[in-house]
Amino acid sequence: MQIMLCAISNIASGNCSEDCKYCTQSAHVKTDIQKYRRKELSQIVLEAKMAKKNEALGFCLVTAGLGLDDEKLEYVCEAAKAVQKEVPNLLLIACNGMASVEQLKELKKAGIFSYNHNLESSKEFFPQICTTHTWESRFQTNLNAKEAGLMLCCGGIYGMGESEEDRLSFRKSLQELQPFSTPINFFIANENLKLQVPRLSADEALKIVRDTKEALPQSVVMVAGGREVVLRERQYEIFQAGAGAIVIGDYLTTKGEEPSQDIIKLKEMGFTFASECH
């Protein structure tokens, strides 16, 4: 079986105006995460080279904040061009919040292949985890990305206190969008966050992967944040459950598995790594 590996770079961290209860980058909570307006282009390129060395096909440029403005758009485009020049065989993904069709077309011109904007949860549950913007605005940005001609990466976070009905509604919304890839994140509570709920069990997490693949058979199911903590020694069972991709290395504000450990284990299990997108 061939799987896709992706890595992410948090190129603008923290001080986000939004009040998402699950996020340590929100300015509404006090956390000890690193905060910076922009990462040096040389550092982004270095991380991209490391991602490629670690068999990654996708590399995501992530910025904190509600969405793109002119300054941030220019910066993301600069970063994309810098990575493309030095590491030409990576598929670039951008994750920069709300964006218009015109802004997204500019990202595509700069070399961005796919846009990631998660719905996070169901339309019904979303007001319980965020009040500073609407679920509908997130859905519209995904429509904008498709109109701009970008591949779509859209998923969310599970284990925030949502019901089974919420998960079903969420999957139905994803079916409307039919994303190329759909990330699954498992919520891990942080003492500084307003959201404090019991952690998902490994069985629940694997069921979520199975249900997502069943709902979206044509999408690449990517297991991302929380994989190592929630699934522990069972984390590689995700592929039997329908996953076709994982995020390797560190996440936005938390540590991930050492990429070399993932690669060794996956090779032992007989997996190969995608070098192009079909």
From Swiss-Prot:
Needed co-factor(s): [4Fe-4S] cluster; [2Fe-2S] cluster
Pathway: Cofactor biosynthesis; biotin biosynthesis; biotin from 7,8-diaminononanoate: step 2/2
Reaction(s) this enzyme catalyzes, per UniProt: (4R,5S)-dethiobiotin + (sulfur carrier)-SH + 2 reduced [2Fe-2S]-[ferredoxin] + 2 S-adenosyl-L-methionine = (sulfur carrier)-H + biotin + 2 5'-deoxyadenosine + 2 L-methionine + 2 oxidized [2Fe-2S]-[ferredoxin]
Record's protein name: Biotin synthase
Assembly and oligomerization: Homodimer.
EC number, UniProt record: 2.8.1.6
Signal peptide residues on this chain, from the entry's feature table: none
UniProt GO BP: biotin biosynthetic process
Organism of derivation: Campylobacter jejuni subsp. jejuni serotype O:2 (strain ATCC 700819 / NCTC 11168)
KW Metal-binding (keyword) present: yes
InterPro entries from the UniProt entry: Aldolase_TIM, BATS_dom, Biotin_synth/BioAB, Biotin_synthase, Elp3/MiaA/NifB-like_rSAM, rSAM
Origin organism lineage: Bacteria, Pseudomonadati, Campylobacterota, Epsilonproteobacteria, Campylobacterales
